[in-house]
């Protein structure tokens, strides 16, 4: 078996490898493109099992496809854990490749869960819609500014038929008029695109039984449910609500020592899109569920609105996690609670 530690960069990769059968080892720098492809294709022809370990990266899709095509095993590792396991102060690309190879050989490589190709493609749908909505919001804000400069303040009514007629009727200077026309054209192109993407999200959510169960929770729509299912993946990876909160970056930073305990802002680790959607959905849930509404008002008075929103988002994330893990809908999770059949754990924490 050939084991390879790969320090991956956008334009090249530094590798350190060893053949566990013959003991042959070496180091090499591979330029991406023909150089890397020729090296791995040559390995595949040798008839030996090959395992490549590298830090998780979002810019290596072509490399992952190449190794999958050649039936070469690829392990992705947690970059933060790999960095923490490095003992030497000297850091070079060659040292990093050696370090990854050593972790693979000793069995300490922190391998992480990797979503499937279909999962990743559906995430692109969610991100594309999210970016289109952000672009539309920027366009609408600029048009609101144009209306305010002309003394028209009608907020959401500006996007109705009468409001648009008022906006188009303003007599503006030449370049201001050009700006208004271009922004309106952009808005007219974005609206049908977003509507089409929203319908696609709803269709994909209908195909997923897990998303359908999550959508029974008040405030959780197709977008939030599908995003939660795609990003969490296998719910069995997590043992308790604290782990899911930490995975989504909804827990505070902590810098404690001795008797001093200092908590900061949330870590914001994990997927920012799902965190955003949970905050939005939690506000709707807080208006719908009486107990949550009381909790939200209490937190708002004690800690402020921003902290209260994040706290409710964390509460929603934990509840959706247990619904997904147990395969329950909203009525079942309310009736039986999150931690039924777990007498050995208190509050789901090991």
Residue ranges, per PLM feature:
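A detector of single, family-specific signature residues
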Residues: 1-350
